[in-house]
Amino acid sequence: VTGAEPEPESEPPHPALGLDEVVHQKTRLALLTVLDEAGRADFSYLKRTLSLTDGNLGRHLDVLAEQGLVQLDKGYAGRRPKTWATITAKGEQALAAEMRLLAALLSRFEAGKRD
């Protein structure tokens, strides 16, 4: 007998540690949420809905596309060039995981307010 104390039960990691840097950024989280609701949306709709500039929207869509969270398709509506964004299965999974973590954070916050 060494007299060592038993290992304390390990607590699960704090939900904030699991937040995804790519998804959690405000504009990208908003884009994924809008695309999850709409399924597919064109650049103009996203720009108008989220009050973004062309450059800002383009950059955030590129980041999401690079991570495989959205698919960007370019084409034409009549003679006008158009870009459409669609959330991918990976994007849906990432958004759902982020929302679960945010819900866990909210639960912890609300539990702390009752004390």
PLM-predicted stretches and their roles:
Residues 2-16, 33, 92-115:
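Amphipathic alpha-helical dimerization/coiled-coil segments
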Residues 14-56, 75-86:
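N-terminal helix-turn-helix DNA-binding core of bacterial DNA-binding proteins
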Residues 61-62:
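Short, hydrophobic-biased segments on the C-terminal half of alpha helices
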Residues 68:
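Glycine-centered, phosphate/nucleic-acid-interacting loop/turn motifs that mediate DNA/RNA or nucleotide
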Residues 72:
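Short beta-strand "wing" residues that participate in macromolecule-binding interfaces
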Residues 87-91:
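Accessory beta->alpha helical hairpin/"wing" motif in late/C-terminal subdomains of nucleic-acid enzymes
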